[in-house]
């Protein structure tokens, strides 16, 4: 596998830390050892997160190609758009963000706090759009790029989650390399890796990265899209493309994509009682915050699997904390009593 042939612009501090979740592990019976790899602590750019890791492999093209405007898209509380706004500010570029109405949640402050607030503070041109949630290329995003061209700019397209970009999976191939280096220091290997999965490139890159040492099917994606067929197709397609790019040396097949569909509901962006319990439990036992859209759902999945005995006794499980906490402010009503 060869990742070094791709240019990378450093936006992160270095390898994100791996920390034990000792009290959570003990609370759940002590038979499974839980750890977290903290992508929520990976950068000083507006709280970082998994998209910052991905953007390291996209921005060299933007810089070398003379692009002057990063154009991206997400929901109103998109972590992706916040991270793109931060990178644009860091690079001295303009930024246009399309924020669609992906979440069926009504709150007077939803479009004024959290991620979208930070994007505005960082100077992004934020454009609200009423379109609902879906996975793939969006007309509103294409129009935003056309607007930049019409005004004399040169837009660099960054799709939702970086996932439709050919290099969208590379950052999480590197994630797997980091984990292997950290495993050498820890003196053991993780038996399972749990990750939230929606637009697909985080899960796909990780799958390819761990396929290099035979652990592709030990990467457990927790669907948070509530459109699992689309997410599964995205993960497979992106993983197959990424495997070819990095010369993995073997084909990625549908059997390599492990996607647990139990925890996404009632719909994208809306938590259920299990999600909220997982958020509170992890916060109160570990001081580690997760969000109702992504990490709360993957945390719910991991906790539930431990409780149900789905991990063999003695397993060491790595939870990929992808970020997302800035969105908590937009859901303050759900946590008014803690």
UniProtKB/Swiss-Prot annotation:
The active site is at 78 (nucleophile). It catalyses: 1-aminocyclopropane-1-carboxylate + H2O = 2-oxobutanoate + NH4(+). Transmembrane segments: none annotated. Keywords: Hydrolase, Pyridoxal phosphate. GO terms for biological process: 1-aminocyclopropane-1-carboxylate metabolic process; amine catabolic process. Its EC number is 3.5.99.7. Pfam families: PALP (PF00291). One of its GO terms (molecular function) is D-cysteine desulfhydrase activity. Its cofactor is pyridoxal 5'-phosphate. The modification N6-(pyridoxal phosphate)lysine is found at residue 51. It is an enzyme of class 3 (hydrolase). Catalyzes a cyclopropane ring-opening reaction, the irreversible conversion of 1-aminocyclopropane-1-carboxylate (ACC) to ammonia and alpha-ketobutyrate. Allows growth on ACC as a nitrogen source. Belongs to the ACC deaminase/D-cysteine desulfhydrase family. HAMAP family: ACC_deaminase (MF_00807). Homotrimer. This is 1-aminocyclopropane-1-carboxylate deaminase. The lineage of its organism: Bacteria, Pseudomonadati, Pseudomonadota, Gammaproteobacteria, Pseudomonadales.
């Amino acid at each position: 596998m060869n990742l070094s042939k791709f240019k990378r612009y450093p936006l992160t501090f270095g390898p994100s830390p791996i920390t034990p979740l000792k009290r959570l592990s003990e609370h759940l019976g002590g038979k499974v050892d839980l750890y977290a790899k903290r992508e929520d602590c990976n950068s000083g750019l507006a709280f970082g997160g998994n998209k910052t890791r991905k953007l390291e492999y996209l921005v060299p093209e933007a810089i070398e190609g003379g692009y002057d405007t990063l154009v991206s898209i997400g929901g109103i509380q998109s972590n992706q758009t916040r991270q793109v706004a931060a990178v644009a500010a860091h690079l001295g570029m303009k930024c246009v963000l399309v924020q669609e109405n992906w979440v069926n949640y009504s709150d007077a402050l939803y479009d004024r706090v959290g991620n979208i607030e930070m994007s505005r503070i960082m100077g992004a041109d934020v454009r609200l759009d009423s379109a609902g949630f879906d996975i793939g290329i969006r007309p509103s995003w294409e129009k935003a790029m056309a607007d930049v061209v019409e005004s004399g700019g040169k837009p660099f397209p960054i799709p939702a989650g970086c996932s439709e970009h050919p290099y969208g999976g590379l950052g999480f191939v590197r994630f797997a390399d980091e984990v292997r280096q950290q495993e050498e220091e820890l003196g053991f290997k993780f038996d399972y890796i749990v990750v939230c999965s929606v637009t697909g490139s985080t899960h796909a890159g990780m799958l390819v990265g761990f396929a290099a040492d035979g652990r592709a099917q030990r990467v457990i994606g927790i669907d948070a899209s509530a459109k699992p067929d689309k997410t599964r197709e995205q993960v497979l397609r992106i993983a197959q493309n990424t495997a070819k790019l990095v010369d993995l040396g073997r084909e990625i097949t549908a059997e390599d994509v492990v996607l647990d569909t139990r925890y996404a509901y009632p719909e994208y962006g809306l938590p259920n009682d299990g999600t909220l319990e997982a958020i509170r439990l992890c916060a109160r036992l570990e001081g580690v915050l997760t969000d109702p859209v992504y990490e709360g759902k993957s945390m719910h999945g991991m906790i539930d699997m431990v409780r149900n005995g789905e991990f063999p006794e003695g397993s060491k499980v790595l939870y990929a904390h992808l970020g997302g906490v800035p969105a908590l402010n937009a859901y303050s009503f759900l946590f008014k009593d803690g």
